[in-house]
Amino acid sequence: MDLKSLIRDIPDFPKPGIVFRDITTLLNHPQGLRYTIDTLTAKCRDYGLSPDYIVGMESRGFLFGVPLAYQLEAGFIPVRKPGKLPAAVHSIEYDLEYGSDSLEIHQDAVASHHKVLIVDDLIATGGTAKATAGLLEKIGCEVLGFAFIIELIDLGGREKLPDLPIITLIDY
């Protein structure tokens, strides 16, 4: 199936010169969504990945992470922006091109012996994925790899990530 044909391009969003890759058109296509999750599942199995948890990055990582967790018989854990989780959290601050940001995960969500797979809809510069891996490694989790629907090749995000399996389905 040609997944790229199910992604809508929105020029000049969120600002001039940017082409936004809109996944909502993939999400509302039943066969495309099923194919996406089935393909992610198959690729994870091909790599021999057997995570205890899928860690979904806010917020579109949740959309693909939950069904992938179900398929892999794993739990699901959200990583969120500050102030979005109600209980005690672990956090990590990371640098952006112009400033910094931080991510949080519930303290009781994972433990040092857990194996995790990080999932998001898209990898661009890799900063958020790298920070998520850093947060999980700080806790003592074993990061097994990463899974993304879309990779923006020219932004070089893959090179910033640890030498682990990186699954992508669509390249731009």
From Swiss-Prot:
Q: Which Gene3D superfamilies match?
A: 3.40.50.2020
> Which pathway does UniProt place it in?
Purine metabolism; AMP biosynthesis via salvage pathway; AMP from adenine: step 1/1
Q: Specify the domain of life of the species encoding this protein.
A: Bacteria
A Pfam family the protein falls into: Pribosyltran
* Cellular component GO terms held in the UniProt record: cytoplasm
Xref: InterPro entries: Ade_phspho_trans, PRibTrfase_dom, PRTase-like, UPRTase/APRTase
Could you cite one Gene Ontology molecular function of this protein?
A: adenine binding
Which reactions is this enzyme annotated as catalysing?
AMP + diphosphate = 5-phospho-alpha-D-ribose 1-diphosphate + adenine
Record's keyword terms, sorted = Cytoplasm, Glycosyltransferase, Purine salvage, Transferase
Q: Where located?
A: Cytoplasm
Name the NCBIfam families for this protein: apt (TIGR01090), PRK02304.1-3 (NF002634), PRK02304.1-5 (NF002636)
Subunit details for this protein?
A: Homodimer.
Q: Which HAMAP family does the record associate with it?
A: Aden_phosphoribosyltr
The UniProt entry's sequence similarity note says: Belongs to the purine/pyrimidine phosphoribosyltransferase family.
Its biological function?
Answer: Catalyzes a salvage reaction resulting in the formation of AMP, that is energically less costly than de novo synthesis.
Task: Specify the protein name.
Answer: Adenine phosphoribosyltransferase
